[in-house]
């Protein structure tokens, strides 16, 4: 499959809106709650003078993460319900990783993928590093048979709970707690085939059996194996890399 460079733009919607950004931060609404989070690429000045927020995540002093949330208003510790496209219902929460348990900027990606699979009979797709499953459920809601893979038992448990919330518990979704690279290698040996693969790998991580993942070292082999699970009729291999500052051209090479 030849790399395809497409600009995807997310439109404002009821569940999420990017209200403003600047000075290394962004101001967002998630439903009726407002949050401030770091955004290193927002180097310009904000448009608004004030950002009244329920909570703000203040990062640590280095690029490797860290930091904490500071609440200006009470925020439920066990999360609160949100939805995507009035189809996927899930629990959002202020995580230690500066996000809220899902990635709203993936909205145009999920819509694009659904469009790619729209003409496929019984499409089968895989979500690697699938986290809490909002992307998995977005594709499942459009009729795809899904394989959801994440090394975290807790994340997969939350993804299954989100499927229950969405009324999708009986959908054809395989929930896999496993090291993504090992699982994909086994799928290659099994000669499996997919219509689409989405992966969102971290910079560094550990599998359920202590496997170590380092993006710069392990990504090329994983991508090579993913390509073996696709054929000329497959619709996409979609890689997101928020964890490191690489251009699409570098990744495409």
Please describe what each predicted stretch is.
Residues 10-28, 35-104, 111:
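Non-catalytic substrate-recognition/targeting regions of SAM-dependent transferases
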Residues 44-45, 210-253:
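C-terminal substrate-binding/active-site "lid" region of AdoMet-derived donor-dependent transferases
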Residues 104-121:
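Conserved alpha-helix/loop element of class I SAM-dependent methyltransferases that forms part
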Residues 121-131:
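Conserved class I S-adenosyl-L-methionine
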Residues 132-144:
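Conserved SAM-binding loop of SAM-dependent methyltransferases across substrates and taxa
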Residues 145-150:
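Conserved SAM-binding motif I beta-strand of class I
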Residues 152-198:
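S-adenosyl-L-methionine
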Residues 201-202:
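Switch II (G3) loop of P-loop NTPases
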């Amino acid at each position: 499959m030849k790399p395809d460079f497409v600009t995807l733009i997310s439109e404002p919607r009821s569940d999420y809106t990017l209200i403003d950004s600047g000075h290394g931060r962004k101001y967002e609404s998630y439903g009726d709650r407002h949050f401030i989070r770091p955004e290193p690429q927002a180097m310009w000045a904000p448009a608004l003078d004030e950002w009244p927020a329920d909570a703000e995540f203040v990062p640590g002093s280095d690029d490797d993460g860290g930091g904490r949330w500071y609440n200006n208003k009470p925020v439920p510790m066990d999360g609160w319900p949100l939805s995507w496209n009035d189809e996927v219902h899930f629990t959002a929460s202020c995580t230690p990783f500066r996000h809220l348990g899902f990635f709203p900027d993936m909205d145009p990606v999920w819509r694009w993928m659904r469009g790619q699979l729209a003409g496929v009979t019984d499409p089968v797709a895989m979500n690697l590093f699938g986290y809490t499953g909002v992307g998995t459920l977005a594709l499942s809601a459009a009729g795809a048979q899904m394989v959801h893979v994440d090394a975290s038992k807790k994340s997969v448990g939350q993804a299954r709970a989100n499927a229950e919330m969405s009324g999708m518990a009986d959908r054809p979704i395989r929930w896999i707690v496993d090291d993504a690279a090992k699982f994909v290698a086994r799928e290659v040996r099994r000669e499996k085939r997919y219509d689409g693969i989405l992966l969102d790998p971290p910079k560094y991580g550990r599998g359920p059996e202590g496997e170590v993942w380092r993006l710069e070292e392990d990504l090329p082999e994983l991508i090579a194996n993913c390509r073996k699970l696709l054929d000329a009729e497959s619709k996409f291999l979609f890689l997101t890399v928020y964890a490191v500052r690489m251009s699409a051209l570098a990744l495409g090479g």
